[in-house]
Amino acid sequence: MGDTIKELLNPTVLSALLMGFAFSMVLGPIFIPMLHKLKFGQNIRTDGPKSHLKKSGTPTMGGLIFFISVSVTMLIIEYKPTDEGMIVLYSLIAFGIIGFLDDILKIIHRDNLGLRAYQKMILLLLFSIALAYYGYTNIGTDIIIPFMNSKLNLGIFYIPLVVVYYAATTNAVNLTDGIDGLASSVTVIVLTFFAIVGFKTGHYQVGVFSIALAGALLGFLRYNAFPAKIFMGDTGSLALGGAIATIALILKMPLFIIIVGGIYVVETLSVIIQVTSFKTTGKRVFKMAPIHHHFEQCGWSEVKLVTVFSIITLILCIIGFIAL
């Protein structure tokens, strides 16, 4: 543990954290008025919480802020193109591009219909297969089983399972991004968990990237926390999902996302349960899905929701350390 703390206090690590944070803080006041001027505003669903309707027109695609911040930070740190940290950066960019295209089309069409489902699926499959192949050839097909102190070799099933894993993780983070600051806050904690594990297990570059992205998200939160001046959009949420999935994959810990990313999982399950129940019985289990909207309908404020979900994530990350 002492060595891990030393790594966290390493000048390079601290520089990555501070640079990511500083770049986001600087870019926020540049991007927000620029996106306003371009009329890149969020279209709010009329079937969502009524309190959200006043947010219509809030600049979206804010993921570009931490997207650029962490990219510049990693370039300044001067990692080689084949380093693990850069592989995570590539995945952030790849899935961020999908989100960017989705956001742009939503803005052009002035509705919530961006990329068609099949178009998004094709792009997700292409990037997921490429990353799964990278994992198969460079990382190995074994993954750590939580609480068991053992590994499971996926063998020939590795690539198809990893492709499904990427689709699930990116969409789960996307669903979590439904209220001001929620996805950002939860993901900062998850990234910190993986950064510590990265340093502890010798994956220094992954640890540095995780810290840099956490710093960039903290800077972004200055503008994304309630009341949000900017939304991350699919540009941000899909990029974050792709990055987290790759970080966990390199650490051989994809199963740990079920634990430390428990909020992502619950958000996704709430949608699946709601849709399944309505289609089979005509009844809804929740007042609204994803589940953060259910709690909003129950009278919870966005600030309370973000605080409670963040505390839960912190507890889940502690459980994650126990599961190692």
Swiss-Prot record:
Pathway: Cell wall biogenesis; peptidoglycan biosynthesis
InterPro entries: Glycosyl_transferase_4, PNAcMuramoyl-5peptid_Trfase, PNAcMuramoyl-5peptid_Trfase_CS
UniProt keywords, alphabetically: Cell cycle, Cell division, Cell membrane, Cell shape, Cell wall biogenesis/degradation, Magnesium, Membrane, Metal-binding, Peptidoglycan synthesis, Transferase, Transmembrane, Transmembrane helix
GO biological process: cell division; cell wall organization; peptidoglycan biosynthetic process; regulation of cell shape
Gene Ontology terms for molecular function: metal ion binding; phospho-N-acetylmuramoyl-pentapeptide-transferase activity; UDP-N-acetylmuramoyl-L-alanyl-D-glutamyl-meso-2,6-diaminopimelyl-D-alanyl-D-alanine:undecaprenyl-phosphate transferase activity
Enzyme class: transferase
HAMAP family: MraY
PANTHER family the record matches: PHOSPHO-N-ACETYLMURAMOYL-PENTAPEPTIDE-TRANSFERASE, PHOSPHO-N-ACETYLMURAMOYL-PENTAPEPTIDE-TRANSFERASE HOMOLOG
Protein name: Phospho-N-acetylmuramoyl-pentapeptide-transferase
Species annotation: Clostridium botulinum (strain Eklund 17B / Type B)
